[in-house]
Regions:
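Broad hydrophobic/π-residue packing in well-ordered secondary structure
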Residues: 53, 67, 205-206, 341-343
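Ubiquitin system architectures
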Residues: 1-91
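Nucleic-acid enzyme cleavage-core boundary/entry regions
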Residues: 87-340, 347-463
Length: 463
């Protein structure tokens, strides 16, 4: 019986696919056919590519027989992506310690339910004592979340909350109402912490519509209570609806259940809002790829890009919610993995990357629990549009609003501290053109996974 099998080999090393058919001995290791491929495709270095079958990288020491190839098999050859540059930035990863933060800024922490409840009870008891001893001056002292109390710190490279306070006291009818609302909220939060149950912000509002009057009021009170207690909002067991998803080479426990993110299909695994329920993270990935849009995420998931280049892929489907940001930070802290960002080449894509990187003003008191200050901007860079020959019909003229946002962004301290960001934004403004990630699919829907990302990562072409 013949040991020969027929291999249809697709060359994905270039932007244009080429194919060839080879007859090989099923008992010969794959490495033995590299010389033939070298001759067929004129590949200069035989160690410059890898074999893939069913989207997974193959061990070249094994034979087709060991790999259970059919008599007629289709395999791909792709660039062997060097992770040398990724390894280099991994050595340079930095997480600020307590001593790195400026004196007086508000830094909150994730705390378990019992410790958060203890702080809440102590704060409530202190307020009761105040009302008994000096009722006219009894007040809740809450760190102010006003814009003038928020600033960018160049040392930690984060947006932080200062130590200015606002006073909620029995001094007018309006302040009496706000104190009553805070007291009611504290009672509701105490009940759920005691049972270690989670609720949404909307649930909290509907627990007492008459006193809160509007959900925006209860939402703000929740943030005020968290910062007053020195804990994250998640520590109050109050969560918001989430939209983030993850796929790739990571598994973890969620409420005790084992989650394997390589088996989540194209749709990925929804990121739970209950980040405190995620434990025992394990991964053989080399980096995290944060993607702006779900469409790009689905392309990466369907092509199983993480099997080709070992990574974890996450999207917040646009502007990320708290849970997505906290999940990215959790991976960064627990697994010590570099994070690369893939966004649209426009001011709003950069604004999303900025939120992942330095935090947002609205949640400045939680920046340390959500921001990853050393994220690298992998793409889509404005300079990539010419470098990767994105045609003019796939580029979009910037609107006056786009230009104004870009001009404002270039003046920000965060951007000024990153010269390459300045260069890329200036290039965008000078050409007056922007582009979406989907522009990479102008000729081939797999161009991003087969060519663009492998070459960007291989060469370390990030900002």
């Amino acid at each position: 019986m013949s040991n020969m099998i027929s291999l249809l080999i697709k060359n994905k090393l270039d932007t244009k696919d080429t194919t060839t058919t080879l007859k090989i001995d099923s008992k010969s290791p794959l490495a033995a056919i590299k010389e033939k491929l070298h001759e067929e495709f004129s590949i200069p270095k035989k160690n410059s590519f890898v074999f893939l079958f069913n989207k997974k990288v193959l061990d070249e020491k094994k034979t087709p027989e060991e790999l259970k190839f059919p008599k007629k098999a289709e395999i791909e050859i792709k660039l062997r992506v060097s992770l040398r540059n990724v390894m280099q930035i991994k050595k340079e990863l930095y997480l600020p310690s307590e001593t790195d933060f400026p004196y007086g800024v508000i830094i909150v922490e994730n705390k378990p339910a019992e410790l958060t409840r203890k702080r809440l009870i102590e704060t409530a008891a202190d307020f009761v004592v105040q009302t008994m001893q000096d009722p006219k001056n009894a007040a809740f002292k809450i760190p102010s979340r006003a814009s003038e109390n928020i600033g960018y710190d160049d040392n930690t490279k984060m947006v932080l909350l200062g130590n200015q306070q606002m006073i909620r006291a029995y001094r007018s009818l309006s302040s009496v109402l706000s104190v009553a609302q805070m007291a009611r909220l504290m009672k509701l939060i105490d009940e759920q912490l005691n049972k270690n149950l989670h609720t949404t912000k909307r649930d909290v509002y509907y627990r007492d519509v008459n006193i809160f009057r509007d959900q925006s009021i209860s939402d703000n009170l929740i943030e005020d209570l968290a910062v007053m207690l020195g804990v994250t909002r998640a520590s109050l067991n109050v969560v918001a609806s989430t939209k983030g998803i993850v796929v790739g080479r990571i598994n973890f426990r969620e409420s005790g259940d084992l989650i394997d993110c390589t088996k989540m299909g194209v749709g990925g695994k929804a990121i739970t809002p209950m980040i405190d329920q995620i434990t025992k993270l394990d991964s053989d990935a080399e980096f995290v790829l944060v993607v702006e849009k779900e469409a790009a995420f689905m392309r990466l998931a369907e092509d199983r890009f993480y099997d080709y280049v070992p990574c974890i892929i996450i999207t917040g489907k646009g502007q990320p919610d708290m849970a997505t940001r906290m999940f990215v930070k959790l991976i960064r802290k627990e697994l010590n993995l570099p994070v690369l960002g893939l966004m649209d080449a426009d001011p709003y894509g950069l604004d999303i990357l900025r939120v992942y990187t330095i935090g947002s003003k609205s949640l400045s008191f939680e920046t340390n629990e959500m921001a990853v200050s050393d994220i690298k901007w992998l793409g889509l860079l404005p300079s990539d549009l010419d470098e990767y020959k994105i045609p003019n019909n796939c580029r979009i003229p910037m609107s006056p609003r786009d230009k104004k946002r870009g001009e404002d962004m270039i003046k920000e301290e965060f951007v000024q501290a990153r010269p390459r960001w300045v260069e890329e934004i200036e290039l965008m403004l000078s050409t007056g053109m922007k582009a979406e990630i989907q522009a990479l699919a102008h000729e081939d829907i797999q161009f991003m996974t087969n060519f663009y990302l492998p070459h960007k990562i291989h060469s370390g072409d990030w900002v």
